[in-house]
């Protein structure tokens, strides 16, 4: 009986003895994990610092390059000649009567009769030159160019007619009225995109322009 109790006591002691080393091993592993995590945090922090330093260096280099580029002198050419020195500036140098009420302002520069007649001939030639655009059915360009040139032509013909003697004014006014009737027909043909109507009114407009220009001399 005593031996059995001693055996049980020894067995009980044998089971309890390994508990101490196991706890010590667990604590050591936890310490190793914590040490590894701390080392990883340190490494991550170093990488972040190095990244910020590299970004700062690159930004400084770019800023210096931009400043160096901005410091280069800019070469400026001479101003364009008046009245259409560059594409799209044909109307840029024309006088505006900004001191007058809006309804009385002119958006075209008034010219003497002789110069107005010369500009009217140029506008007429520009209208005649719309033929390729009509053939290509480029209707927006046809309408825009036609309206621009017709506005010049109308204004200059009015200047020329007002300078003529009374007996010549009526004939020019009649021819001008017929001319702008055909121009309106050509504008409408471009609006409805009708090649047949555009060809018809282009021919009539070209003929009417010839009649008017013949009177201008």
From Swiss-Prot:
The keyword Plastid applies. One of its GO terms (molecular function) is electron transporter, transferring electrons within the cyclic electron transport pathway of photosynthesis activity. Pfam families: PsbQ. Residues 1-25, 73-95 are annotated as: Disordered. Its main location: plastid. Keywords: Chloroplast, Membrane, Photosynthesis, Photosystem II, Plastid, Thylakoid, Transit peptide. Transmembrane segments: none annotated. GO terms for cellular component: chloroplast thylakoid membrane; extrinsic component of membrane; photosystem II oxygen evolving complex; plastid. It comes from the Eukaryota. It is found in: Plastid, Chloroplast thylakoid membrane. Signal peptide: none annotated. Residues 1-63 form a transit peptide. One of its GO terms (biological process) is photosynthetic electron transport chain. Belongs to the PsbQ family. This is Oxygen-evolving enhancer protein 3, chloroplastic.
